[in-house]
UniProtKB/Swiss-Prot annotation:
Tissue specificity annotation: Widely expressed (at protein level).
Organism of this sequence: Mus musculus
GO cellular component: Mon1-Ccz1 complex
Family named by the database record: Belongs to the MON1/SAND family.
Matching InterPro entries: FUZ/MON1/HPS1_longin_1, FUZ/MON1/HPS1_longin_2, FUZ/MON1/HPS1_longin_3, Mon1
Modified residues (Phosphoserine): 31, 56, 79, 91
Lineage: Eukaryota, Metazoa, Chordata, Craniata, Vertebrata
Region span, Disordered: 1-88, 113-149
Keywords: Guanine-nucleotide releasing factor, Phosphoprotein
Positions of post-translational Phosphothreonine modification: 61
Summary of the function given for this chain in its UniProt record: Plays an important role in membrane trafficking through the secretory apparatus. Not involved in endocytic trafficking to lysosomes. Acts in concert with CCZ1, as a guanine exchange factor (GEF) for RAB7, promotes the exchange of GDP to GTP, converting it from an inactive GDP-bound form into an active GTP-bound form.
Any GO molecular function: guanyl-nucleotide exchange factor activity
Record protein name field: Vacuolar fusion protein MON1 homolog A
Top-level taxon of origin: Eukaryota
A GO BP entry: protein transport
Length: 556
């Protein structure tokens, strides 16, 4: 079991719990102060946690560095649910997942037979996927011409994934074949430095950052000229790595390259590129990834409590997590006692659902790996939309691949309870306005904000409105947040407060041990008015917290 599952008992795991260290309840502060303790801030859960608790952004990257070096951190873990980790079973599950996502069943056992690689046609690259130019005329080398264009070079960010043997696996823009020589240089550079017992992490030159993340047997590289720090780019690369694990499992990935070091992984991942593409698009515009947290659908507390209780009652023995979501926002989450979901795994589930419209066609039963929870094997996920014309999607995560009918019955019982209580009508009404307006806060110059409760792992933000209505402006705003975030979480010199003035807007960041707050407001505003607005905003969040957060998470 991955080391990301933690017990609630603070006496055993003081930095992995959301409860006060003495085990007693703490009075919630009415107004925020720099000394506000974790667990008392607006949005803090009162009945424990839903997610693996990461104290801060730095914890995520520190943990990854430890895992990469083989130095396992001391963490508290719950009793892992049983998962099939036999390679035959994993191979069968992968074949089912491949069929679900791409329409083509792929047999790992056949892939590993001697000489099988020669029998396969060369995988098609990503030419045209995200390309900036028109397809070339017949007879030309399409990928080479495309990748040589100035338009290709003008992309703000490129992402490459390759094997340690230098085989291309994925490229964000253009064709992997045309970029194979570039990827070969990248892996040669990594290998050259490692021969001297050094590790390359990033290169900074001419406004570009080149960031390397090595997770054997893969090497991931980002080339960017954005406001993101090298640390944040590395975190995005880790999301790509975990996305690959969610499709293959860590056990299968290791097994493949133990058998064939120069294996072309695109054979197994062919057809799933759109899932990785979608993940990169989400990371470019959804602040959930930047905040390392989940956002809740604004919902009356009584309605959310009824939904959570209905999920809790409609359970099967094999269920580990029951999740209801809409518009990439949480409606409710119920978990097995002592089992905690990692925000990264939840984001990957969101990405899986938003990447495929096939889940709307009926009840899907598909293998899925939650790599931060357990990278060794597949869970089985029952995925369905409650009604064809709504965005309410129900995920029921089970440990038993043969338990489809029992889990499907959980869905039926859950829907019956919602209808009996009239809750389905309240959910429909909430979906009519899945985001709230910043005007509700009542601060004239405030344009947008991000607020994260560190103890609950949840954040809230209003709808992005004018003057950020276009996709370009929304990405620019997120880029400003990324800049503030990178300054606040700088590994060598982190900042607690940042005041940024620009030609189009002013921004303020405030990071404490209990929460993170990023505010964007009119360029006509002053620093004094921004500081004054913090207290008004925090009081508003406190007032609305039972609508914006899940304060009483339930367990089986």
């Amino acid at each position: 079991m991955a080391a990301d599952m933690q017990r609630k008992r603070s006496s055993e795991c003081p930095e992995g719990t959301l409860a006060p260290s003495n085990g007693q309840s703490v009075e919630r502060a009415e107004s925020p102060t720099p000394g506000l303790t974790q667990g008392t801030e607006p949005g803090a859960g009162q009945e424990g946690a839903m997610f693996v608790h990461t104290r801060s952004y730095e914890d995520l990257t520190e943990l990854e560095d430890r895992e990469a070096s083989g130095d396992s951190p001391k963490e508290c873990v719950g009793s892992p649910p049983p998962l099939a980790t036999d390679m035959r079973q994993i191979s069968q599950d992968f074949s089912e997942l491949s069929t679900q996502l791409t329409g083509v069943a792929r047999d790992l056992q056949e892939e590993m037979l001697p000489g099988s690689s020669e029998d396969w046609p060369e995988p098609q690259g990503a030419a045209g996927r995200g390309a900036a130019t028109e397809p070339s005329q017949e007879g030309s080398t399409e990928g080479e011409e495309e990748d040589a264009t100035e338009a290709w070079r003008l992309h703000q960010k490129h992402v490459f994934v390759l094997s340690e043997a230098g085989k291309p696996v994925y490229s964000r823009y253009g064709s992997e074949e045309a970029l194979s020589s570039t990827m070969g240089v990248m892996v040669a550079l990594v290998s050259f430095l490692e021969a001297d017992k050094n590790a390359i992490r990033s290169i900074h030159a001419d406004g570009y950052k080149v960031v390397f993340v090595r997770r054997s047997p893969l090497v991931l590289v980002a080339v960017a000229r954005t406001r993101q720090s090298a640390q944040e780019l590395a975190q995005e690369l880790l999301y790509i790595y975990y996305q690959i694990l969610s499709l293959l499992t860590g056990a299968q990935l290791s097994h493949i390259f133990q058998q064939k070091q120069n294996y072309d992984l695109r054979r197994l991942l062919s057809g799933s590129e759109r899932i990785t593409d979608n993940l990169l698009q989400l990371m470019a515009r959804d602040p959930s990834f930047l905040m390392g947290a989940a956002r809740c659908l604004p919902l009356a507390a009584a309605v959310r409590d009824t939904v959570s209780a209905s999920l809790q009652q409609a359970r099967a023995r094999s269920l580990v997590f029951s999740i209801l979501l809409a518009h990439n926002q949480l409606v409710a989450l119920v978990r097995r006692k002592d089992q905690f979901l990692h925000p990264i795994d939840l984001h990957l589930l969101f990405n899986l659902i938003s990447s495929s419209s096939s889940f709307r066609e009926g009840e899907a039963w598909t293998p899925v790996c939650l790599p931060k929870f357990n990278a060794a094997g597949f869970f089985h996920a029952h995925i369905s939309y409650l009604e064809p014309d709504t965005d309410l999607c129900l995920l029921l995560i089970s440990t038993d691949r043969e338990d489809f009918f029992a889990v499907s019955d959980c869905r039926r019982r859950f829907q019956e309870r919602l209808r009996k209580r009239g809750t389905h009508l309240a959910l429909r009404e909430a979906l009519r306005t899945p985001y709230y307006s910043v005007a509700q806060v009542g601060i004239p110059d405030l344009r947008h904000f991000l607020y994260k409760s560190k103890s609950s792992g949840l954040f809230t933000s209003p709808e992005i409105e004018a003057p950020y209505s276009s996709e370009e402006e929304q990405e620019r705003l997120l880029g400003l947040y990324q800049y503030l975030h990178s300054r606040a979480h700088n590994a060598s010199r982190p900042l607690k407060t940042i005041y940024y003035t620009g030609p189009n807007e002013n921004l303020l960041a405030w990071v404490t041990g209990a929460f993170e707050l990023y505010m964007c407001y009119s360029p006509l505003g002053t620093k004094a008015s921004a500081v004054s607005a913090i207290h008004k905003l925090m009081r508003w969040i406190r007032k609305e917290e039972d609508r914006l957060f899940i304060l009483t998470p339930l367990t089986y």
